[in-house]
Amino acid sequence: MSKEKFERTKPHVNVGTIGHVDHGKTTLTAAITTVLSKHFGGAARAFDQIDNAPEEKARGITINTSHVEYDTETRHYAHVDCPGHADYVKNMITGAAQMDGAILVVAATDGPMPQTREHILLGRQVGVPYIIVFLNKCDMVDDEELLELVEMEVRELLSQYDFPGDDTPIVRGSALQALNGVPEWEEKILELAHHLDTYIPEPERAIDKPFLLPIEDVFSISGRGTVVTGRVERGIIKSGEEVEIVGIKETTKTTVTGVEMFRKLLDEGRAGENVGALLRGTKREEIERGQVLAKPGTITPHTDFESEVYVLSKEEGGRHTPFFKGYRPQFYFRTTDVTGTIELPEGVEMVMPGDNIKMTVSLIHPIAMDEGLRFAIREGGRTVGAGVVAKIIK
């Protein structure tokens, strides 16, 4: 068994528990690590080790999150669990812990509750692609019909937010009994693990996606032309390939005639690397920070979108006062700030620090964007909010 730990060949998948307060998310997290460590190696984590989650900072926002890891026969999982509802909201909006899939925990004794709905909605808005349901505390419900009713309610709720409710795997279990080592309930954790392995597809790695490089700096090198620098966000760029320059201005095409790193010429630049790309025939003044280089036809510039936003509280260094419709802050995408105006949902007059809210944004310049792109909201260089593009309008 001990040899298992050093195998880095298994695909890596990011998951997390979501759901209403006290429905058993943390107990389930502990149960998964405990049961799977018996079967596939790895470390068991006790409830209280997970529950006192350390504080982290993501984009200046304080979030309490616990990270655990576990293995199944075919995969390695990184799993996040948050103690408080506000932590989930912040986590999902900032993308601090990107999830390839989520385990929605619903207590069979209660059925779906307000945060159950809110977490499903957030999952939809921020692009959590797959949800598996763990119906918890089933040891406390004798009535088969009641279980079926709760299951039906959960499926309806998922369908309401465009998840495939009818096809979603639902496991009936008891996290506490599994944690206590009761075999019939341990079996349910293995069933959950099986669904994780089969229902959540292996995520596409950044390197396999189409090339994208957010431009941080632009230089002109006499006799050679214009060089842009930045960190490759996804994909690979090779010398000789055609790229588009997208955002802020009209989209144009150019050819990359050289890729360098630390002043050395490379054959290619790969996701995660900081590179300089030499562009053929592009003038220094035609290109600026905030644009992106991308594989032609893979990303388009937009100004108007629907977003899900978390507004920092005063304690987090955010605003001390609410804002109203017509608010005009800067929206920081990748490497640059763009001014934009906001529209609030009908019936919402103002937004308080610490709130999360759905808002429609209209930028003064187009930015290269996809649904799921994260941004910060800033006033004079200070971050006052974090958001994610939920739906592109134009």
UniProtKB/Swiss-Prot annotation:
NCBIfam families named in the record: EF-Tu, PRK00049.1, PRK12735.1, PRK12736.1, small_GTP
Enzyme class: hydrolase
Name the UniProt record assigns to this protein: Elongation factor Tu
Region: G5, residue numbers: 174-176
Cellular component terms per the entry's GO annotation: cytosol
Assembly: Monomer.
Record region (G4): 136-139
Record-listed GTP binding positions: 19-26, 81-85, 136-139
Chain positions covered by the region annotation G2: 60-64
Alphabetized GO MF terms: GTP binding; GTPase activity; guanosine tetraphosphate binding; translation elongation factor activity
Domain tr-type G: 10-204
Chief location bin: cytoplasm
Positions of Mg(2+) binding: T26
Entry-linked PANTHER family: ELONGATION FACTOR TU, MITOCHONDRIAL, ELONGATION FACTOR TU-RELATED
Location of region: G1: 19-26
